[in-house]
């Protein structure tokens, strides 16, 4: 009588939980970039990795519930983006590794002890935002040499945005610009923000990064700028693709791609406490010439020469 071979148990497939602060449509390219990063680390969705994705729809009030739901699934790694979403996930767990795809200032927010030595369960990418607002404001001034009054859209609930707002104030003083603070903390604030910019007669507007509400509504924001013939500056090119005038910043898909490789390292045994937080080194200036024409703006040739991409 032959000996029956024992069936081998199926190998466990690791699980990654992903909390995206925006809509599925807005996050599409970023999700694909993250999956590519995981693939390069040897993890293919549906074969060697399982993904659990939740979308915040640009509403930070939903983040705590979605974070709790993801943590209850006991993933091996959590990936998220923007300070409100990172904070929501971190409140739910101090043991499951968390990879930040985008954070304004993780040291100031307390997510990590330092960029070189995170020290806890959080690591990933920082956008060094506090150093960027001045450059963006200066570029906006270069586009409009006669600029004197700029509306600044921001979310005061985002700690990194508070730091960047202070930076923008300092640079504005040096450029002799008057800043109008326009707070956007919820979807309902957007119409009020548009009304405030119109009534105060802003000559241009400038969006601080890390605002999932604004990212989810970037088409509406860009459309407002065109209708009011207001030049605009944004932190990422996704706004310019939707009709905004200019952006200066790192590539979001590139950061999500890198977050995927971080998740892969952790799945292979690396500890987030020992993985330094990375900062982007390449920043792109993108100008939408179609929008410039629509709002009656002639972009100075010197600025056009500095652009990394011109959208015709």
Question: What are these model-predicted stretches?
Answer:
Residues 1-312:
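Short hydrophobic alpha-helices and adjacent helix-cap/hinge residues
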């Amino acid at each position: 009588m032959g000996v029956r071979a024992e069936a081998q148990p199926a190998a466990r497939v690791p699980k990654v939980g992903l909390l995206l602060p925006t809509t599925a449509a807005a996050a599409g390219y970023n999700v694909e970039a993250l999956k590519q990063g995981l693939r390069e680390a040897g993890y293919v969705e549906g074969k060697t990795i399982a993904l659990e994705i939740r979308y915040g729809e640009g509403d930070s009030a939903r983040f705590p519930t979605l974070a709790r739901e993801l943590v209850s699934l006991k993933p091996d790694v959590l990936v998220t983006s923007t300070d409100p979403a990172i904070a929501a996930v971190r409140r739910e767990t101090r043991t499951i590794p968390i990879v930040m795809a985008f954070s304004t200032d993780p040291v100031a927010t307390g997510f990590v002890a330092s960029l070189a030595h995170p020290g806890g369960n959080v690591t990933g990418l920082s956008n060094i935002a506090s150093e960027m607002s001045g450059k963006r404001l200066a570029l906006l001034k270069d586009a409009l040499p006669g600029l004197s009054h700029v509306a600044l859209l921001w979310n005061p609930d985002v700690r990194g945005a508070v730091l960047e707002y202070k930076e923008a104030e300092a640079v504005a003083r040096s450029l002799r610009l008057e800043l109008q603070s326009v707070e956007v903390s919820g979807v309902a604030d957007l119409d009020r923000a548009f009304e405030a910019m119109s009534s105060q007669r802003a000559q241009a507007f400038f969006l601080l990064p890390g605002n999932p509400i604004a990212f989810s509504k970037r088409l509406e924001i860009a459309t407002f700028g065109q209708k009011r013939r207001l030049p605009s500056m944004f932190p990422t090119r996704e706004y310019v693709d939707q009709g905004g005038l200019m952006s200066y910043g790192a590539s979001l898909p590139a950061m999500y791609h890198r977050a995927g490789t971080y998740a892969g390292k952790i799945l292979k045994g690396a500890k987030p406490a020992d993985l330094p937080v990375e900062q982007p080194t390449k920043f792109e200036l993108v100008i939408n010439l179609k929008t410039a024409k629509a709002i009656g703006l002639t972009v100075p040739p010197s600025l056009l020469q500095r652009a990394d991409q011109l959208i015709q």
